[in-house]
Amino acid sequence: MLSRLVLTDFRNHADLTLMPGSGFVVLTGENGAGKTNILEAVSLLAPGRGLRRAALGEMARQGGAGSFGVAATLFPSRLREGSGEGATYVLASAPEESAPLPRPLPQAGGELEAQGQIQAPVDVATGTLASAPERRIVRIQGATTTANALVEWLTILWLTPAMDRLFVAPAGERRGFLDRLTLALAPAHAHHAARYDAAMRARNRLLADEGRPDADWLSALEAQMAEHGAAVDAARRETVTLLGTRLAEQDDGPFPRAGLALEGWAGDTTRLQVDLAQSRARDAAAGRTLSGPHRVDLIVTHLDKARAASLASTGEQKALLLGIVLAHADLVAERTGQPPVLLLDEVAAHLDPSRRAALFTRLAGRGQVWMTGTEDALFDAIDGRATRIAVGR
């Protein structure tokens, strides 16, 4: 969990410090106040481009120095539970008209205690420099590292209004969603996915060159794709199996049970390497690689109604997606010993009162949950303490 969050020149926040407790963190304020911007900042403490998938240059505050910083202190959730914090009312300052140059990213010292288990407070930070606005910097305990290293210390899952149509969106969006779920259970997944994509881009460029491509170089790239692609496929399928089993075993409740399956390419290292070697001419003509795990789709069904999620009503699709995320959060906590941080943007506003109350009951005592809404009344059903933050007031 995050025990401290500092934003410097991030979106509309010039200089913002929050001290959230464990459990519920409720952000309320008018539209445009910067609630989702805070969630986006938290989401950058995970590998990837954050919950908006925006370019880094877009995140720096307009009128600022052209850079931004997001810093946080991570604390073991198990040590904070029942410690008496919470019920803390923090007033987030309104965006400033001007601000000094952003502070440098923290340079805290100390040794990391253990991979994947936070034994003591850990300082993490990410951001950019004005001289390189599209180059992301990541630091853990003051040491510069890669974004993929963040997953060893913190798992973050999110739901946003933009994901409401996930089941009818292009397959690539569902693959991206599945990859985030997989990464939480298999930290090496990000490495394999990045290496696979890099090798595939290099192969595509080589096939597009005029003249006869270098066969040995093609074979070397295809061997890399086969090695990392098979690992990507295996991790995804393991996640689908584990999560699908958990969903199927759940009792009927306010969130319908979802069935999960993968459709498309499947195979091991040998199968993928053979497929790639045999499809060079076809891929060259198409201008892209047509076989491999990048062509897989996540198929979701409404189990209780035995029909595709894409055919469900808008309300049912939202409830199915929320049920998947909740089940996955339980699975992560069970298998890693640390509950994930959940970011739920405007989720409460789209649920009826009974489902909203059921959501709060389900999430109580299960880690840190950040939620946004325009009205305080949306969160009246929270039973217990919460950090309530008024944004932009």
Spans of features found by a protein language model:
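Conserved lysine of the Walker
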Residues: 35
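Nucleotide-state sensing region of NTPase/ATPase domains
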Residues: 46-78, 85-100, 112-173, 177-189, ...
